[in-house]
Amino acid sequence: MNSNQPLIHLRAIEPEDLDLLYRIENDVKLWNVGITNVPYSRYTLHDYVANASYDIYTDRQVRMMVENDQHEVVGVVDLVSFDPSNRRAEVGLIILNAFRRQGYGSSALESVMEYALNVVHLHQLYAYVDATNEASLRLFQKMNYQPSATIKDWLFDGRKYRDVVLMQRVI
């Protein structure tokens, strides 16, 4: 990890994280940067936390909490759409507003890349980034993701369609 980046560690979701996950999943401002566009109930999230195997081969996804060195949760990182045959997965990242622009996004992407490479033995990570989300595009490029395609009208925000940039990193 780069010495300029804050120290973080990734950990499994705990029942105590349910309130934070509920706020994240139901934040309508985040719906237009991903595929979620409906609210999640506490019951649904509780069921996910209780029943996820945390085995990426079983669930085809894994979600981890991002903690700083003071053990504060600063965000959430996901590997989803796991494809073991082609050794790739989509990465998703949310850094809480209070912790943005402090290097936590870079640290989280670096840590999840190390996990993907050394534990899951993936060959590639990718992300779909809203073409208007300049901060996320800069972050992924800084972390050696390459823009490989622009997908037209991929996201709909309720008023208009927006393009996404497919960002890929071969690891």
Short names for language-model regions:
Residues 32-34, 61, 164:
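Short, hydrophobic secondary-structure boundary micro-motifs
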Residues 29-30, 35, 50, 95-96, ...:
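A broad detector of the eukaryotic-type serine/threonine protein kinase catalytic domain
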Residues 1-47:
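A short, well-structured alpha-helix characteristic of acyl/acetyltransferase catalytic modules
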Residues 39-60, 68:
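Active-site rim helix/loop that mediates acceptor-substrate recognition in acyltransferases
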